Amino acid sequence: MESKVTKNTLRSSSWRVNLSGNSAALSTRLQQQISRAIVYSGIPQLILETIPLERCSDNTGVAYRSAIALKLSRAMQQSPLAIAHQLTVSLPTITQDAGKQNLIEFEVEVAPPGWINFWLTDQGLATWLQDWIQPSTDTLISFRPQQGQKNLLPYLELTTQHSALFSQDTSKIFRVQYAHARCCSLLGLAHRQGLIQIQSMDLKTSKGLIVVPYPIPWLKDDLGKGTKQPLIQLVHPAERLLIGQIMDLTDYFSGTESKHWLKLASSVSNAFEQFYRSCRIWGEVKHQTPRLAQARLGLVGVTQVVLRSLLEDQLGVLAPGEL
């Protein structure tokens, strides 16, 4: 669940975390780094899942907030602010090697009474989005590894076993399937019109990756005033909402086995429909700002990967390329 966060901070620094691995969950990566900082600080190690961390509601970007210093203050008999400073100093520093590692950058801040805020930079967000649709890897395509070959069920051919599970949710499943098919349709049209190039786009299996442009132009050409840092193109509220839903989904799936797959899938598909209604790709956008059109198509590609994995890997139903 989201919470509010403000930039009323006492300290700010730049910090990177390694995204390599088989999980797209930023929360898990951050908890791992906080756990290492705890060990480096000489504090008894905590179970990873007990490290408090939540994604925060912020209209200007992606932020996570940890109350770990507040949690440790009583046992350590120190002020939360002092502990927060100690932990941020101890956060592991990773030297970037662009050829071997996939790193995303955060701004780390300490705020009263002892919060540690992690602000994902626009460059970091671009890296995270691109990692979903990398032509060279599929480590982030599925939330969980598939166990053998599955017999996927189309929406209209649910068995008795599945109908018991989805008795009151068939319309929700169809809406998720519809959103997935819409993603495939948009990507296919963009491919035919030359906006992007898709590798092995098969509408029957709905498995395709954007190979041109590479990488997707997630960032603007010009740098932000004052910061001199590249800025993300996807700033519309509907774009932010969709990205946030996907982040929440991946964070949720990094934990224990979920019984709410359909609810999570519905949240993503609903956010996609709002994005589709609010953010144009064709017409003036395509002709006047083609890089923005390509960035939005990149977000469509990320959504397609997410919905396909939810439908086929988790719900056991077909992710159709067309309806």
Feature map (PLM): residue ranges:
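Non-catalytic interaction-recognition regions
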Residues: 2-323
